[in-house]
Swiss-Prot record:
Name of the protein described by the UniProt record: Translationally controlled tumor protein 2
Gene source species: Arabidopsis thaliana (Mouse-ear cress)
Underlying gene: TCTP2
Loss of function: phenotype: Seedling lethality at the early rosette stage when homozygous.
Similarity field: Belongs to the TCTP family.
Cytoplasm among keywords: yes
């Protein structure tokens, strides 16, 4: 099994159990989350109304929700993140990262009001990567976006 860790914090954020699709020139990974408790159709007879509904990715990787960002806060976060991450990339990836991160940032900013923000379980929001979750129109399960260059692949 492959696990993907945040390069900056070491937090596990994703595994190969969750297929991803590269978007924005490979800068972002898009992953479909599931709400297993909401997958069973039919009547809710005997189901506790107080039951907590969990999303698989959030639960599996113990992601911690963060307060929303406004545009200014998000730009500040991205500038800091780029500055922290760039030196950790090899020269080839640094070039690709610098070439495409601006368009990926603009893409994320266009959806900013729709996002829920998450960090890894260490809650190093100032130091690590963000995971973005949003619901597509009509969807009951969230879609997650990961900053791909901030992930390190580890074999387990």
């Amino acid at each position: 099994m492959l696990v993907y860790q945040d390069i900056l914090t070491g937090d596990e954020l994703l595994s190969d159990s969750f297929p991803y699709k590269e978007i924005e020139n490979g800068m972002l990974w898009e992953v479909e989350g599931k709400n297993p408790s909401g997958e069973e159709g039919g009547e809710d007879e005997g189901v506790d109304d107080q039951a907590v509904k969990v999303v698989d990715i959030i639960d599996t990787f113990r992601l911690q929700e963060q307060p929303s960002f406004d545009k200014k806060q998000f730009v500040m976060f991205m500038k800091r993140y780029i500055k922290q991450l760039s030196p950790k990339l090899d020269s080839e990836n640094q070039e690709l990262f610098k070439k495409h991160i601006e368009s990926a940032t603009k893409f994320l900013m266009s959806k900013l009001k729709d996002f829920q923000f998450f960090v890894g379980e260490s809650m190093e929001g100032e130091e690590g990567s963000l995971v973005f979750a949003y619901y597509r129109e009509g969807a009951t399960d969230p879609t997650f976006l990961y900053l791909a260059y901030g992930l390190k692949e580890i074999k387990c």
